[in-house]
Amino acid sequence: QAFNRSNFQQEIHELFYDLVVFGTAALFVDMDKDGLRFNARHIAEICISENAQGEVDTVYRKFEMTARAMAQRFGLENLPDVAKKDFEKDPYKKHKVVHAVYPRGESKGGVGKQKAVASLYYHGDTLQELGEGGFDSFPFMVPRFVKDSVSTYGRSPSMNALPDVKMLNKMSEVTI
């Protein structure tokens, strides 16, 4: 039932779109007060890394948040001075945020900072830590459409059509 009450249906379409167009997609899964929360993340926001088994186990995500959203998410007291000032004067001014999600090594679990998967948020300009937590298991699903053995990122079907598209564009320039 928790799955049915979630926003999965809205987010899975974005995931499939990114997967077919770019060859790699990312879906973040978290819990909030209402239950499961899914969030498709654009491939331009993330960098991924694989473990020895070829599974994605590390994601670095760079994105923007308003000063208001940062205060709601991390607490005003945890923001750098520049974000605190913006919260007072221009709460909708955007700031860069980096979210790092990676395995803690040999951690067997626990609570918060002792969980098996680390989750750290930093302010993108000041590099001040905004918040740290963790997950019991890796919270990103990162499907790749077609991947060869030496690549981390996937290839999409659109990459096969790209040379033909470029040729047709050139042909239309010449005939116009």
What are the roles of these predicted feature ranges?
Residues Q1-I176:
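Extended alpha-helical, oligomerization-prone segments that build pores/tubes and scaffolds
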